């Protein structure tokens, strides 16, 4: 059992939940249910600065190392780029899409970022933006899903490929170079669709050809993704699946996928309502099969853990949840 090497309560406000934890080189940034976010020193967990009320409800936060920044999005339809070097005194750039509640965000290595939206006026859309410009969005796709977008991730090697997940139970692969509504079938941006059958919590590339999917009902599967020889069509097949991870892992909920120091594996973090522990199960990124991991984190309360992140370089886990505590665990 690993106990916390340092802990900090992120706010004096009642019911201030930690939503997400993102890592920078020397810092971690944390978003809250109050619409605020803070930057902490990785080693000491001392708060360096706080951005109060950055959004009405902050729904996504990602690091942008190329610009020494952080990008956030919110349910009020705003996106902001913040400069860490100036302690985020004000947003460096902002983007707005009227009446579009953003739900999630992802960044590629070409300084482009994607956002997903709630179902609004019968449309659940995915947008592509240029982080270097406040001009209008590059592209928007409305046909990939028919309910709230819940998760986005760019391919680890191909910056033009975007994986999207939704409440509709579908995981879609988009070519972000292509426009929607093209009359040429070969120019269709929707390359492939996986029907997982339940609202998507997580849809993530764990390698170039493997996609892990986890639903809000805790159903789990690993899919092999294949580009056919003509390089115009894609296919997938399920390698491994579990109907309910709660029964398999004897837990109450699954938190998220986290990196490991071994590239053959990633891990799933999970918790239980009846104790303080956060546990892990290793996932073979080639087969999707699960392997027991002995590491356990003893958190400071029994409140639900909402976010966890692993610093591979320094062997430190960062966790946070509905107790409002940010904790570091050195393993």
Curated annotation (Swiss-Prot):
Coiled coil feature spans: none
CC terms in the record's Gene Ontology section: cytosol; nucleus
Organism domain of life: Eukaryota
Keyword Hydrolase applies: no
SS bond list: none
Main location: cytoplasm
The name this protein goes by in its record: Uncharacterized WD repeat-containing protein C63.06
WD repeat segments: 53-92, 97-139, 144-184, 300-331
Pfam family, one: WD40
Keywords for this protein: Cytoplasm, Nucleus, Repeat, WD repeat
Location(s) in or outside the cell: Cytoplasm; Nucleus
Keyword check for Electron transport: no
């Amino acid at each position: 059992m690993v106990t916390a090497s340092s802990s900090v309560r992120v706010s004096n406000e009642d019911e201030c939940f930690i939503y997400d934890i993102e890592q920078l080189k020397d810092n971690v940034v944390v978003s809250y249910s109050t619409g605020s976010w803070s930057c902490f020193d990785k080693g000491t967990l001392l708060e360096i600065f706080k951005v109060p009320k950055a959004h009405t409800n902050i729904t996504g936060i990602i690091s942008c190392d190329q610009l020494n920044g952080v990008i956030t999005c919110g349910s009020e339809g705003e996106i902001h780029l913040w400069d860490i070097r100036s302690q985020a005194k004000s947003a460096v750039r902002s983007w707005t899409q009227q009446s579009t509640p953003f739900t999630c965000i992802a960044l590629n290595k070409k300084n482009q970022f994607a956002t997903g939206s709630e179902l609004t006026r019968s449309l659940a859309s995915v947008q592509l933006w240029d982080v270097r410009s406040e001009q209008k969005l590059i592209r928007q796709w409305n046909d990939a899903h028919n309910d709230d977008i819940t998760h986005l991730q760019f391919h680890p090697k191909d910056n033009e490929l975007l994986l999207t997940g939704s409440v509709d139970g579908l995981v879609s692969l988009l070519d972000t170079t292509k426009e929607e509504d093209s009359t040429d079938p070969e120019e269709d941006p929707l390359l492939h669709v996986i029907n997982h059958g339940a609202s998507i919590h997580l849809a993530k590339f764990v390698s170039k050809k493997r996609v892990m999917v986890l639903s809000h009902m805790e159903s789990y599967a690993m899919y092999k993704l294949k580009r056919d020889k003509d390089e115009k069509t894609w296919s997938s097949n399920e390698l491994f699946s579990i109907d309910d991870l709660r029964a398999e892992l004897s837990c109450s909920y699954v938190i998220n996928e986290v990196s490991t120091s071994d590239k053959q594996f990633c891990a799933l973090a999970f918790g239980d309502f009846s104790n303080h522990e956060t546990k892990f199960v290793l996932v073979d990124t080639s087969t999707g099969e699960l392997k027991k991991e002995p590491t356990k984190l003893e958190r400071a309360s029994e409140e639900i853990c909402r976010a966890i992140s692993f610093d591979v370089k320094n062997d430190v886990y960062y966790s946070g949840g509905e107790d409002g505590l940010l904790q570091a665990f050195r393993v």
